[in-house]
Amino acid sequence: MIGRLQGILLEKQPPEILLNVQGVGYELLLPMTSFYDLPEIGQETTLFTHLVVREDAHLLFGFAQKTDRTLFRELIKTNGVGPKLALAILSAMSVEQFAYAIEREELSKLTKIPGVGKKTAERLLVELKGKFKGVKQSDFFVESTHIPLSPSIESHSESSSDEAISALIALGYKPVEAEKMVKRVAKPELTSEQVIREALKVAL
C-alpha cells in the first residue's frame, strides 16, 4: 500500500496532478481542498495517499492533510459512496465544514454536492454522525485564504474558466451546470484554482 509520496510536481490539471518521485511519475487525483495547497510546478510537495484497486484501473488519491484522507476512507465505507463521489464531497467542503453539516444534520447542504441525493445524504448522517466530536466548532467556518497570483500561472480568464469547467465536470457536475457556476464567479485576474474555489463556495 502506498501511504505517502514526496516528489516534484510536474503537472497540474485539476483535479489531477503528475508527481515525479525519484524518476517515477505518479498520477494522482486530489480533492480541490488539497489542490489549493499545492506549490508551483517544479517544486517539491508531500501528499498522503490512498490506493483504490479496480479490475480496470489502479487509482491513486492524494491529500494534503491526514485528516482529509481519514474522512475519505470513512466516506468510501459508506454504502453508495465510491471514491469519485468521496472526492467530490471533499472538493465541495473542508473536513470541518462536512463535520458541521453532519452534526447539524444539514441535509440541504449535502444534497447540493453532485451525486449526493437525499438517500445518500441520510445514509451519511446515520453512519457518520457522532464521529466528529473532536472537531472544534471555531474551525467550522474558517475563511479560505486567497492563492497569490504568480507570473508563471496562466491568468487569462478564458483558459482559467475552461480549466475550471473541466475540473467541475470531472467532480460530477453537469457541463451546463459547471459552465453556469464558473460564469458567476470568473474574473480575468483569477487562476483556475481560484475560480474553482469560488464556484464551489457559491454552489453551497
Curated annotation (Swiss-Prot):
Has three domains with a flexible linker between the domains II and III and assumes an 'L' shape. Domain III is highly mobile and contacts RuvB. It comes from Haemophilus influenzae (strain ATCC 51907 / DSM 11121 / KW20 / Rd). Homotetramer. Forms an RuvA(8)-RuvB(12)-Holliday junction (HJ) complex. HJ DNA is sandwiched between 2 RuvA tetramers; dsDNA enters through RuvA and exits via RuvB. An RuvB hexamer assembles on each DNA strand where it exits the tetramer. Each RuvB hexamer is contacted by two RuvA subunits (via domain III) on 2 adjacent RuvB subunits; this complex drives branch migration. In the full resolvosome a probable DNA-RuvA(4)-RuvB(12)-RuvC(2) complex forms which resolves the HJ. Residues 156-204 are annotated as: Domain III. One of its GO terms (cellular component) is Holliday junction helicase complex. InterPro entries: DNA_helicase_Holl-junc_RuvA_I, Hlx-hairpin-Hlx_DNA-bd_motif, NA-bd_OB-fold, RuvA, RuvA_2-like, RuvA_C, RuvA_C_sf. This is Holliday junction branch migration complex subunit RuvA. Keywords: Cytoplasm, DNA damage, DNA recombination, DNA repair, DNA-binding. GO terms for molecular function: ATP binding; four-way junction DNA binding; four-way junction helicase activity.
